Structure formats: C-alpha cells, structure tokens
Swiss-Prot record:
GO CC terms, sorted: cytosolic large ribosomal subunit
GO molecular function, one term: structural constituent of ribosome
This protein's record includes keyword Ribonucleoprotein: yes
Keywords of this entry: Ribonucleoprotein, Ribosomal protein
NCBIfam families listed in its UniProt record: L29 (TIGR00012)
Protein name: Large ribosomal subunit protein uL29
PROSITE patterns: RIBOSOMAL_L29
Entry's Gene Ontology BP terms: translation
Organism, as annotated: Thermus thermophilus
Similarity field: Belongs to the universal ribosomal protein uL29 family.
InterPro entries in UniProt: Ribosomal_protein_uL29 (IPR050063), Ribosomal_uL29 (IPR001854), Ribosomal_uL29_CS (IPR018254), Ribosomal_uL29_sf (IPR036049)
Gene: rpmC
Length: 67
C-alpha cells in the first residue's frame, strides 16, 4: 500500500486523473457484479473505494502545490 502511494505521488496530475477514472470504472463493474450476486469478495469494493480516495488526496495535494 505504501509503495502504491509513493508511485502515485510520482505521477503527473493528468496521469492521476486517468488512473482515478479507471478505478471508478472498476468500482462500477464491481458494484454491478455485487448487485446481481456474482461478487463473492465484497471487501474488494471497500478496498477500491479507499484506493480512489488516496489517489484523489494525492491529486489534490499536487493541485495545491501548483496553485
């Protein structure tokens, strides 16, 4: 987890936005699977939401530094 955060801090804001969009798409797919009963590992939704929050935090930090 710490490595992922360090890697995210190395990315540019544009790359971070792209990664957030990809993760949100994954979250949408997981929610769909959960709604039709195909998802057996419900913790993946929570983990993915936390990843998105971390990425958004890093993105906001970068935006504040550039402002």
């Amino acid at each position: 987890m710490r490595k992922q955060l360090e890697e995210a801090r190395k990315l540019s804001p544009v790359e971070l936005e792209k990664l957030v969009r990809e993760k949100k798409r994954e979250l949408m797919e997981l929610r769909f699977q959960a709604s039709i009963g195909q998802l057996s590992q419900n913790h993946k939704i929570r983990d993915l939401k936390r990843q998105i929050a971390r990425l958004l935090t890093v993105l906001n930090e970068k935006r504040r530094q550039n402002a």
